[in-house]
Structures are given as structure tokens and as C-alpha cells.
């Protein structure tokens, strides 16, 4: 299971979230990307407390592709410092994990 990761990334608009998700899947960097309904994010940025509507991407992929995904998200994203957080997948359906392998580089 240590070969698979789950990456989260937030985007300010649904259209940007879709643009990122389609690029990652088309380029075989991710097997699947889910996009949440709008969420409310509160954060500190440049000394100000901000609260914005965002769309959260849930990216399923192989650990070996994490740096390529980070680079691609940064190329497409409008934020100066986009959220890109990877978590290991510690357990999952063997069939689903095999599918991730067949759908990615």
C-alpha cells in the first residue's frame, strides 16, 4: 500500500478545479480526481485572516508521481502558494489500487 497516495488541493473556482483534474487524468498523473461541493476555508495570508469559498480536489495516484503532480498543479493554479498535501493510502481495495496502477504512468 505504500506506493499509493491521496493528494488534496484546493481551488478558488470550480472551473479551475476541473481544469486541474482533467489535466492530471489526461496526462496519466492521476487515476481519479474528485471535486467537492464548495467548502468554506479560513486561513491567514500575509497578515490577514481570510475566509473564502473553495473547491477541494481529492487526487488518487502513485507516490512516484507526487513531484510531477505538484509541478503540474503549480503551473495551472492561480494561487501563489496552492495547497498540495499528500497522504499515504494505508489500506484499500486491491482491485481499486490495481486500477490506479493501470491508469497512471
Features from the language model and the residues they span:
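Positively charged, small/polar-rich N-terminal and surface patches that mediate targeting and assembly
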Residues: 1-105
Amino acid at each position: 500500500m505504500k506506493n499509493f497516495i491521496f493528494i488534496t488541493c484546493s481551488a478558488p473556482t470550480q472551473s479551475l478545479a476541473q481544469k486541474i483534474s482533467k489535466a492530471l487524468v489526461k496526462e496519466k498523473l492521476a487515476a481519479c480526481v474528485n471535486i467537492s461541493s464548495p467548502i468554506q476555508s479560513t486561513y491567514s495570508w500575509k497578515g490577514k485572516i481570510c475566509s473564502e469559498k473553495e473547491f477541494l480536489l481529492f487526487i488518487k495516484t502513485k507516490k512516484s508521481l507526487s513531484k510531477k503532480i505538484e509541478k503540474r498543479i503549480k503551473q495551472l493554479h492561480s494561487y501563489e502558494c496552492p495547497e498540495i498535501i499528500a497522504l499515504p493510502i494505508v489500506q484499500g481495495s486491491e482491485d481499486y489500487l490495481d486500477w490506479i496502477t493501470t491508469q497512471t504512468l
